[in-house]
Amino acid sequence: MIAKPFTPMNNHLIMLYRLDSQNAEYNTENSNVKFRPVSKRFIDCFQNGEDTTDVRYAFSINKKRQGIKPIFCGIRAAEFKFMEAESYYHLGKQDEALKSLNELRALRIDGVKPYTMETLPEAPKSDLITTDCDGKPLTKLLAAILNERHKEFFLEGDRFFELKRNGGPEYWVAYNGRKYTNFHYMYTLPIPEVDIHTTKGMIQNPGYTELEY
């Protein structure tokens, strides 16, 4: 876990060079997070009473449902543990994938009992991800791996890419009385207009030419 976002710890392999306490933009965004209630979708990740036993909950959310975890951009050792678990899964080595998942959970959740194939929980009903990177419906094991990943990398810039590589689900959020929809095509960003105008044959990515401003 990240205790001091500005000081490299033992499991910080790479840190963004702009991540320092003198960066006004970083401090502004870190302050703004506290004015945005944490989504129920994220809270639902902590199943079966784990909101009181999982250290990530207390580190991420306060009693007012505000995000209190410092924004972070970098690579931690936990990232490789999740890569290991998911790689084992996609190679068909489910026992090894489950073992990797249990090893990480044991470091995060007080008194946790290891999952077995029989005790794996259902995926949270509110979760946006329902298919894997191959478009196949999630199994309980993969859903558990992705659920733990969601908890682990909250406010670390990971979620967008998780959604993108696992089906690119469409969803909407409300803000100031308006509904904002994240459409599937938006997982691929638009090409800047200046590049299209100055590069012969350059075509805008699908979806953006139909937008009305």
Please provide the spans of the model-predicted regions.
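Acidic/polar-rich alpha-helix caps and helix-coil junctions
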Residues: 1-24, 44-213
